[in-house]
Amino acid sequence: MIDKDKIREGMKLILEAIGEDINREGLIETPDRIARMYEEIFSGIGMNAKEHLSKTFEVHSNDLVLEKDITFYSMCEHHLVPFYGKVHIAYIPNGRVVGLSKLARCVEVYSKKPQLQERLTTEIADSIMEYLDAQGVMVVVEGEHMCMTMRGVRKPGAKTVTTTYRGKFLEDESLKNDVFRMISM
């Protein structure tokens, strides 16, 4: 549970610490706005994707399923600034599939907390393997990190790409290549 009162007080302290007047017209409501925003963007804390991935549908095919270009927004746990991009999820069902929107909800659960892109990638893959009992999962995440864009090295447009493979994707190079080809279509 997010403690909005602590966030408000902390935000006031930060504004004062950087030399701002917390009673200035444009800043008076900022601590409250930040508290409400944090409640939304950190809503994945303490959650897992089980509730979204538990309702499945029988299929008579074990062919590859790919949901690509799922937009995500998250907060870098090192600097608490945004990183955002696209997630591509491929899985091989084991007789059961999940509604496609549930894959996007899975991404939401794990992206809405202080996060590392590497961990985001593996948490998505592990949850799909576990809750869908998939034969294999491949997750590719492309992200732009504001901690590299607006501070430090200041390299706007630089993308970080992370991948992880589970099950059949560990064994079959041509399967991975098929997914990369479909992602680039």
From Swiss-Prot:
Zn(2+) binds at residues 76, 79, 147. GO terms for cellular component: cytoplasm. Pathway: Cofactor biosynthesis; 7,8-dihydroneopterin triphosphate biosynthesis; 7,8-dihydroneopterin triphosphate from GTP: step 1/1. It comes from Clostridium perfringens (strain ATCC 13124 / DSM 756 / JCM 1290 / NCIMB 6125 / NCTC 8237 / Type A). Keywords: GTP-binding, Hydrolase, Metal-binding, Nucleotide-binding, One-carbon metabolism, Zinc. This is GTP cyclohydrolase 1. The gene is folE. Toroid-shaped homodecamer, composed of two pentamers of five dimers. Its EC number is 3.5.4.16. Pfam families: GTP_cyclohydroI (PF01227).
